[in-house]
């Protein structure tokens, strides 16, 4: 290497305030271990990133087979959000229409298209959808007990119609019910009364029904959630689902949906079906039995006010909250703002998922809820092309989950044979921790992409704190040591950085100059060549 020198490639990287690398083999070169002679300033490039175990998920099926897949443009996989997970909330009866005969292709055929593009899938198999059948009726025929419900319409003095779901009594009359779906416009009233959402494939053969026909009149039979026959059949379903999906790396999460309205763990519209704490725990245990690898999520309504918070946390079950923007009596126009109190019990160790109401007028409310609840996942629970969502999606994407940002890297002199001391500053500018963690890693790479030296920091990005709304993320400092080889051929060389989770996974970072398809980013460059 005698008679050769390293020269800086001036202006190679925008945003490098100072990258004055030491010229090798010159007198005085190679300062002390803490003599950081090179300072590299880095900036968040504001890119919209996807990363493992976080981000947007799109509701392809929302309890029924009609929303929101019918709004999705053909061939669009929502890369511009970016959305990397498609979510199926679908009635059990669609997947197991006959006992032991599974129609997995109903969702898998769609899922395969997304997986082929490097995306993920997620599920919530629903037992109860108020108004339409979700439990296959062969469960009832096998002896399970439950309650038949039907909707009735009551006209109000202002001309609106309020729909009330009531249990059908043994004598054919309707019992007391709870108000739901107030102030629907007239065209929606006719649809709700005469067509409904038809969640059952064999629902009245697709024909309109008449008032008083309680078996078909936009109602449903709801199983008792502690019924032993039901639990046996449901366990068989979960066993089959676990065998199919638990070892599939493309499955992002499974939401627990086997009790309560829409699988949300509450019985607001089906109060004749009680849900005890012991019943809830039994359902949780069944999911845990058959899903040992996939992240499980539970709705906040299923655990609120119970000792099940501790049970779910101890067993690694994350929190899902579907309340954002949901209107309520006497509340503000933007509706509910997210269950911050319960999210605070989970987010430091487990992911939080938020779902907004299917209206999208108040997307600022959604953004604030994501920040306040420190959400990892956010659902696109609407037509993905509505203007109000388009205005906020980029801002949400830059905040949702974790966002690992290097602000400065400092090094000692870099030359052949040097033991380069590296110090760096990082923040997590996202809303949630990077739960799986990872280690900042530095590389010496030549122009052909060959790695000549690697330095793995002991610093773990899992330890980066996240800020509350209105506050700045705390910067933390880590170190690494990069041993430069004694001999380097004439070439251009790059100092690159990445954050590595495991041998197969590195994170996307908001930096320019990515090293090919790898998650390595060039932050400085120099050449080895003959003296001029």
Where are these regions (language model features)?
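Active-site cleft segment of glycoside hydrolase catalytic domains centered on the general acid/base Glu
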Residues: 188, 195, 200-251, 255-287, ...
